[in-house]
């Protein structure tokens, strides 16, 4: 249920755009016929260039009236006649008060999901997914960046906007609050009064350092007393609205989906039958944008697109209803695009999956996607992750896309885990500053409902009852993922210049802070960073 808003809003936004485009084309055609009947004394000018138009509509854009109902649609060929308006307020209320099949699932949790998962944005940026850098015209419109560029950040904003604060130096544990938290994490039994002093110095409505310190102090306090987290009382409405606020304010999920989808498009550019195996699917938000791009690619529409969805661990023990709802939404959207689409939910536990669990036809080009989910299988032994990667390798994929958070929390002792997470979350909390006021209720909700719970979980992961092989969900840095991918038999695929340029355009067009930057690193990683702290990394493998 929590992800229905994510998926349906985006799908409907794209569908509505396509419908409006069709209506505009029909209107233009009708006007042209009328002009032919009445002589025009003024000849039409002839331009030697083409204007960018509806061919590159935005897979992330959401209008003021989203919803996932296709009124008057008895068949996808009649999509252009759907003219009923969609009311965003009524739609949001229906999400909170109603729901899809996943809401009735008692195993579907409110918490435990990714803090950067995609949510519809009111901002708008053009989609360049359907323009693979193969032809000369595309390269003229968007020149590739210099190969030597390793770190890039958007140009300074226009003068009417206040300049952002200057970049800060590398993470400094000498910040009094952070140093006190780290010292307490090292030897809590010898510093019983430290936690009290920390609580007196932090605030959930202060500056980013005080706000991060507040949630770590709360987590350490709950760990010591073994009391339940107060954030667990947040409502489903808070959860939904928090994701929306985050995605409006920050580019995390947009960057991850855009970069991975571009790699998939380039790897399957001439393929007619495409099969995507998605490890850890929620509501399929990533695939709405890809379907749109495939429907308009220069080499023509694929003959068939199939997605095999392996449920995300956070969907609980009964993910079937949620997967069925996801498949139905994607099928309806594919019909709007006139695409031959199939969706297969894979309900076998991941530990029991093998090659026979998937229907793979000989003429298919297969793609495997791990998007912000593989770390949830990661424990200190990496056994389950290794099993999943070897399974993916056995399917002989054309490309494997991997997106992960950029912080080492797994194979480190508790004090270093706290130190690394302080660096990570201080950057995340700071990244909310440009677009969310400190006294904003929306910001407080995002930090409490999304990040506060994550901090609580990573602190509690060091409990004595966590036996080896039972502690999951702690993130790793890209170098460890490189080791795991290469151990499973994969080799890296360097992102194309076009993919990098496209990620830069995302930051440009959304007018994000200049403290966001892209960092390219060997052998083929591209990371989104805030103030020189990488937060999210996407890579491709084969």
Curated annotation (Swiss-Prot):
Which residues does the annotated region (Leucine repeat II (LRII)) include?
Answer: 325-357
Q: Where is this region: Leucine repeat I (LRI)?
A: 171-224
Q: Which parts of the sequence are annotated with region: VHIID? A: 243-309
Comp. bias intervals (Low complexity): 18-30
Report residue spans for region: PFYRE.
366-457
Q: Name the residue ranges with Pro residues bias.
A: 154-169
PANTHER family the UniProt entry points to: OSJNBA0084A10.13 PROTEIN-RELATED
What name goes with this protein? Scarecrow-like protein 7
Its taxonomic placement starts with: Eukaryota, Viridiplantae, Streptophyta, Embryophyta, Tracheophyta
Q: Which gene encodes it?
A: SCL7
